[in-house]
Design a protein with these regions (language model features):
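Hydrophobic faces of well-ordered beta-strands that scaffold small-molecule active sites
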Residues: 78-80, 121-123, 163-165, 191-193, ...
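Catalytic metal-binding/acid-base residues of hydrolase active sites
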Residues: 83, 226-227, 258, 278, ...
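Aromatic-lined glycan-binding groove of carbohydrate-active enzymes
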Residues: 270-303
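Aromatic-anchored helix/helix-loop segment that forms the rim or "lid"
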Residues: 103, 251, 295-324
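Acidic-and-aromatic substrate-binding clefts and catalytic sites of carbohydrate-active enzymes
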Residues: 102-103, 131, 169-175, 198-205, ...
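Mid-to-C-terminal alpha-helical segments outside catalytic/metal-binding sites
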Residues: 17, 22-63, 71-76, 80, ...
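Short, Lys/Arg-enriched N-terminal segments with co-localized hydrophobic residues
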Residues: 5-20
Length: 381
């Protein structure tokens, strides 16, 4: 049973307090499930003479920060990559994998959003979602509890949160039921999927019934990388999230486009959002074009026109080199704002975009306008 700091029981559907740090033995979840370790703002920092002087220097240098990087008085940004950690999910992760979930609370989310001028965050649960290696009723119940938690969060903070529903893939039947409930009853903005499930990438034919239903609904599918079965801990001392997450996004995109299921070609009405500026995809387009050229009958126009149909958010993909590669591959209309909170602060993405010296019009397009087009319920009246 999960309890808050006052010892009160915290059921899965209750939005209260913070995700407790569950003390167990085993691997820390940050090494295998989360995006990466949280940055320093979430750790305590002692007050010293040096820190006071550094703070004064920061104030004096504030004018050097580009105006676009300052959080506006009226929040405008829409964050499509913002994790929540429902207590019921945290408990399931500890029970199945061990370790301590990263610290998270609703107030932490709101504080970070306010600091960065984020009007609304579309939430998704943290890795690994609800998949712990078994197709069973527990995964279905956990998905339902997480989605109802997210819906309660929306009700408690109108306008600040929306959600991408988690579904119990690779359980096809359970996933179809949860899609119906989450989209029709809870009114989620779309579905969150992970790049791979027990070695099966999203283009695997086993998932065709799910994508067929999502295509019928013209649904939004937000995706997030996870630890691939093929490639964990290949380089000693380098976390999987550092090296493999971006590659795994590219693997699953390749499976959707070039795999035997031809999912991306068969179901063009699904709106895919890829994390982290598309992983390594923007750097490998010439190789995929060469592959498409060898399969002219299937890809008469090449691969890039298909990649340009997808959407990409910029969390942890907002350095000048990554943005340059992304903007070379797709137009501004396909790029969205994302933070990867609580593993990164939203201001990191704000600053990254500002450093690229985009026009005000392009910034508005990325930070809000594209989201308003995809999610019209978010647009201010």
């Amino acid at each position: 049973m999960l309890t808050d700091r006052k010892g009160r029981r915290m059921p899965g559907g209750q939005v209260e307090g913070e995700t407790p740090m569950l003390k167990t033995t085993g691997l820390n979840l940050l090494s295998g499930c989360a995006c990466c370790e949280p940055r320093a703002p979430f750790a305590a920092t002692p007050v010293t003479r040096r820190s006071i002087l550094a703070g004064g220097a920061a104030v004096l240098s504030a004018a050097a920060v580009p105006a676009a990087a300052q959080a506006p008085a009226k929040p405008r940004r829409i964050d499509v990559h913002h994790h929540i950690i429902p207590p019921v999910q945290a408990e399931a992760i500890v029970r199945n994998r061990g370790g301590n979930p990263v610290k998270w609370s609703v107030s932490m989310s709101l504080e970070d959003m306010d600091k960065a001028g984020v009007a609304t965050s579309i939430t998704s649960v943290q890795n690994p979602g609800v998949w712990f290696g078994k197709v069973d009723e527990d995964a279905r119940k956990l998905a339902r509890a997480c989605n109802e938690y997210a819906a309660k969060l929306e009700q408690d903070h109108p306008g600040r949160f929306r959600s991408f529903a988690v579904i119990p893939l690779p359980d096809t039947e359970g996933s179809l039921r949860e899609i119906e409930y989450a989209l029709d009853v809870l009114k989620a903005e779309g579905v969150a999927l992970w790049t791979v499930y027990s070695g099966k990438y999203l283009g695997d034919p086993a998932f065709v019934p799910v994508f067929e239903e999502l295509n019928r609904r013209k649904a939004v599918v937000y995706t997030h990388p996870t630890t691939p079965d093929c490639c964990g801990n290949l380089v000693k001392g380098v976390p999987v999230s550092t090296l493999e997450y971006n590659h795994d996004t590219t693997r699953t995109i390749a499976s959707l486009v070039f795999g035997e299921g031809k999912t991306a070609l068969r179901f063009p009405d699904i709106k895919f959002i890829w994390s982290h500026s598309g992983g390594t995809l923007p750097f490998l387009t010439s190789r995929f074009e060469e592959l498409a050229g060898r399969r002219k009958q299937e890809f008469p126009n090449g691969a890039v026109p298909i990649f340009r149909r997808f959407y990409y958010e910029v969390a942890q993909g907002n350095t000048p080199g990554m943005l340059a590669a992304l903007f070379h591959m797709v137009p501004m209309s396909q790029v969205m704002f994302g933070s990867d909170f609580p593993y990164r602060e939203a201001m990191e993405a704000v600053q990254g975009l500002a450093n690229y010296k985009l026009s005000e019009a392009d910034l508005r397009t990325i930070e809000s306008e594209n989201a308003y087009k995809m999610f019209p319920r978010l647009k201010p009246a």
